[in-house]
Amino acid sequence: MEALYQSTNFLLQKVQHDLGRLEGTQNEQDAQVVVQCIYGDVITLKENCQTLDNYVSREPPARRQAARMRVDQLRADVHRVDMAVSAVHTRMTQRWRAATERDELLRTRYRPNDTALSIGDHELLLNDRLQSSHTHLDDLISQGSAVLENLKSQHLNLRGVGRKMHEIGQALGLSNSTLQVIDRRVREDWILFVIGCIVCCIFMYAFYRFWRG
C-alpha cells in the first residue's frame, strides 16, 4: 500500500507540473498534446485512489484510521487538481475559439446586393472588445464554479475528518469536552463554508449586473 501511495502522490505532482506547462503553451496543437497526457494521468490517479481504498480496508485496526485519513486527503487533492485541469482547459478553449473567430472576422467581407463592404477599424475594435468581455465573463464563471466545487470538497472532507475524529476520540477515551470542542470547530467551518458560497454568488451576480449595464 505504501508504494502505491507514494507513486500516486508522485503522479499527482507530475499532473500539477503539466498543468503549468499547459498554461504556458502557445498554440492549440501543443496544448492538446499536454491535455491528453494530463487527462490520462487523472484517470490513473482516480483508479489508484480506488485501489488504495481497498487496501485500507485490509489494514490492521490500529493503523486503519491513519491510513484512511491519508487516502482521503490524497483523494481530495486529486479532486482539486481535476477541477483545476477542467477550468484551465475550458478557459483556454474559449480563448482559442475567440481568437479563431476574430481571425475569421478579419478575413471576412460582407457582400449585400453584390456590393463589397469591408468592416471598418472602429467596428473591428468594438468586436474585439465584445469578444474580450465575453471571454472574461466566461473565465469568471469557470473560476467561480471551480471555487464553489473546491469549497464543497473541503466541506465534505471536514465532515469526514470530524466523523473520524469522533471515532478516534471514542477509541482513545477522549472526554466529552474535547469532543464538544471538535464539534464546535466543525460547525464553525460549516458556517465559513456557507458564508464563502454566499459571498462568491453575490460577487458573480454583481459582476454580471455590472457587465450587463
UniProtKB/Swiss-Prot annotation:
Chain ranges on the Cytoplasmic side, renumbered to this chain: 1-189
Superkingdom of this protein's organism: Eukaryota
Cleavable signal peptide: none
Keyword Isomerase appears in the UniProt entry: no
Coiled coil: none
One example GO MF annotation: SNARE binding
Vesicular side: 211-213
Keywords: Endoplasmic reticulum, Golgi apparatus, Membrane, Protein transport, Transmembrane, Transmembrane helix, Transport
Cell compartment(s), UniProt: Golgi apparatus, cis-Golgi network membrane; Golgi apparatus membrane; Endoplasmic reticulum membrane
Main location: Golgi
Cellular-component GO terms for this entry: endoplasmic reticulum membrane; ER to Golgi transport vesicle membrane; Golgi apparatus; Golgi membrane; late endosome membrane; SNARE complex
Residues that span the membrane, as ranges: 190-210
Membrane topology: Single-pass type IV membrane protein
Pfam families documented for this protein: V-SNARE_C
GO BP terms, alphabetized: protein transport; vesicle fusion
Family, per entry: Belongs to the GOSR2 family.
Oligomer status and interactors: Part of a unique SNARE complex.
Purpose of the protein: Involved in transport of proteins from the cis/medial-Golgi to the trans-Golgi network.
The protein, known as: Golgi SNAP receptor complex member 2 homolog memb-1
GN (gene name): memb-1
